[in-house]
C-alpha cells in the first residue's frame, strides 16, 4: 500500500510557527532555571519589522540560560529559529534589565 504524500504547505496563520517557538522557548527555559516562575517570554515585532522573541529570566538564572561561552544561548536560538520556520531574533534579558528597559520606553499620551 502506498502512502499519500502531503505537500509541505505553510499554515494560513503566518505567526503560527513563531507562537510555537515562543511556547517551546518558555518550556525549555523553565527546565533550565532555578526560578521557573519568573520566566517570561514575549513575541513582538521591532521597528525594522523583524519578529523578536524576548526571554526574561531572574538575574540569578541568566548564567544558566546563557551557558559557558554562550553555548546554551546559541542552542536555544538555533532550536527557536528552526521551530519558527523563519527569521526571528532571540533576546535574553534578566528581569532587572527588562524592568529598566520598560522604564526607558517612551509612553504614549
Where would I find each of the regions flagged by the language model?
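RNA-contacting regions in translation and RNA-metabolism proteins
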Residues: 1-62, 74-75, 79-109
